[in-house]
């Protein structure tokens, strides 16, 4: 998810 938890697993950058 884009900006979900900032996890690499979630594929987001935490924004």
Curated annotation (Swiss-Prot):
Localization terms from the record: Plastid, Chloroplast
Assembly and oligomerization: Homodimer.
Cofactor(s) named in the record: Cu cation; Zn(2+)
GO cellular component annotations of the record: chloroplast
Record carries keyword ATP-binding: no
Manner of cofactor binding, per the entry note: Binds 1 copper ion per subunit. Binds 1 zinc ion per subunit.
Induction: By water stress.
Family statement: Belongs to the Cu-Zn superoxide dismutase family.
Keywords noted in UniProt: Antioxidant, Chloroplast, Copper, Metal-binding, Oxidoreductase, Plastid, Stress response, Zinc
Protein name listed in UniProt: Probable superoxide dismutase [Cu-Zn], chloroplastic
Catalytic activity from the UniProt record: 2 superoxide + 2 H(+) = H2O2 + O2
């Amino acid at each position: 998810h884009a900006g979900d938890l900032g996890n690499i697993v979630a594929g987001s950058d935490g924004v």
